[in-house]
Amino acid sequence: MPHDQPLSRIQTRNRRVILDAALEEFAAAGFAGVTLDRIAAAAGLSKPNLLYYFASKEAIYTALLDDLLDLWLAPLRELDPAGDPQAEILTYVRKKLALSQSHPRESRLFANEVLHGAPRLGPVIAGPLAQLVADRAALIRGWAQAGRIAPVDPHHLIFSVWALTQHYADFEAQVRAVLGPAHDPYAEAGPFLETLYRRLLAV
């Protein structure tokens, strides 16, 4: 599709329909398990029509991953050096849990990519993502060194937030099966995680 002209309303809608359909397919089957024919069928479009918007399966997958990373990393970027350290970190935890609840397919897509060695995201993870984490880790380390939060390894603190929030999306079937239908995993996880991190960070 030509990129030097603004999209019409119909083109914008069709592009969104394709990405939504592809997200569902990739999150369920991974990159290797999905074909352009399958995405086109899920989107309700012909394959030639789909190829008007995206040149390949890889292009669709890359567009999804790019959108996901922007969404996923925004809360980490928003840590405010001028804010209260414990409040900033707890807000980050809440935002990450909310993203897992509102975007479970995106979380599973990212997990699937990483579990396969991040063949398409490797340079981004080793570059911009690693740099952002290093910057935020330096901020958290500074807070700890100033005695504003308890001493913690900042990288592993960030990893723990990823693990403890994204688990509820990536392993949703397991969580719901173990807890049973009477439980709301996200409503219960929120207070638990807040207590956990308050205790971890308290000085």
Question: Which residues does each PLM region occupy?
Answer:
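C-terminal peripheral helix-coil segments that are non-catalytic and often amphipathic
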Residues: 1-2, 98, 102, 130, ...
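Hydrophobic/aromatic residues within well-ordered alpha-helical segments
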Residues: 14, 57, 64, 68, ...
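Amphipathic alpha-helical segments used for helix-helix packing
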Residues: 101-123, 171-179
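Hydrophobic alpha-helical connector segments
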Residues: 77-108, 146, 154-161, 190
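A contiguous binding-surface segment within folded domains or other stable secondary-structure elements
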Residues: 111-141
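Amphipathic alpha-helical linker/stalk segments
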Residues: 2, 62-91, 133, 139
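N-terminal intrinsically disordered/low-complexity leader segments
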Residues: 1-13, 24
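Helix-turn-helix
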Residues: 17, 21, 25-59, 63
